[in-house]
Amino acid sequence: MISPAQDPYASRTDRSSAIIARQDPVVYGEGKFADALSADQVQSYERDGFLLLENLFSDEEVAALLAEVERMTRDPAIVRREEAITEPGSNAVRSIFMVHVLSPILGRLVRDPRLANAARQILGSEVYVHQSRANMKPGFKGKEFYWHSDFETWHVEDGMPSMRALSCSVLLTDNNETNGPLMLVPGSHRQFISCVGETPRDHYKQSLKKQEYGVPDPVSLQLLAEQGGISTMTGKAGSVVFFDCNTMHGSNSNISPWPRANVFMVYNSMENTLNPPKYGLNPRPEHIATRQAFKAVRPLDSLKLVER
């Protein structure tokens, strides 16, 4: 086991919070492993820690994806599974995990070359699905997701060694300024925020509803935001946001009348598979962090998302 003193990204120890310079590349292999993105797009991702591609999916594709996600949220057999997470204080579905396994069309989505090849290009290797989920924010009552770095959680609770993973968020509804869109801090991916507080056992059972550990301190957050600002990922349904595993992000609650729904695919490099979790923690379930049943994503030969 690597001690906190030897871990470049030690977090949730008895030490105080700290800002630590990133030790890993942002784009691996000079972005030449695949060719889904232009050189300018790769450069933008490397600089900011994220990339918004507008109108990547057609209206027909979006309609099929949204209908499937809505079906899943109404399916009692899915809602009562451990993969379904409800909002704090209600039975409204907040997230459904492992959607690429539970749904054939979402299984094709994770292999769509527009997503998978972009991930392979940025991460410089073959990739597998570390996690997939559908996130819903119903109008008037969708709750916020507080600021966090995914890598902080994946490093501590899942044993992910390095910052060689990314998320892509496929917008299934219009994301506007009022319905709780994703917010990211440009440039924050180059700094790791070490958090305080020992992780409780089975922390995931509460953190997926409301995260209280692995949360960056206000002083560090303010510094990152003053340096980089805050970018709001607004766009039409069918747009996609790719963002680095260490980019600081969050979203406000949705008190507007307009619901928001996104599907997230998390790709991890096949050269960055999980170690045991830190500090003797038990591994999180497979539907949250793929540890056993993983294989390289094989991109579809052509765009076959909607079968006719």
From Swiss-Prot:
It catalyses: L-ectoine + 2-oxoglutarate + O2 = 5-hydroxyectoine + succinate + CO2. This is Ectoine dioxygenase. It comes from Bordetella bronchiseptica (strain ATCC BAA-588 / NCTC 13252 / RB50). Fe cation binds at H148, D150, H249. Belongs to the PhyH family. EctD subfamily. GO terms for molecular function: 2-oxoglutarate-dependent dioxygenase activity; iron ion binding. It comes from the Bacteria. The gene is ectD. Homodimer. The keyword Iron applies. 2-oxoglutarate binds at K137. NCBIfam families: ectoine_ThpD. Its cofactor is Fe(2+). It is an enzyme of class 1 (oxidoreductase). Involved in the biosynthesis of 5-hydroxyectoine, called compatible solute, which helps organisms to survive extreme osmotic stress by acting as a highly soluble organic osmolyte. Catalyzes the 2-oxoglutarate-dependent selective hydroxylation of L-ectoine to yield (4S,5S)-5-hydroxyectoine.
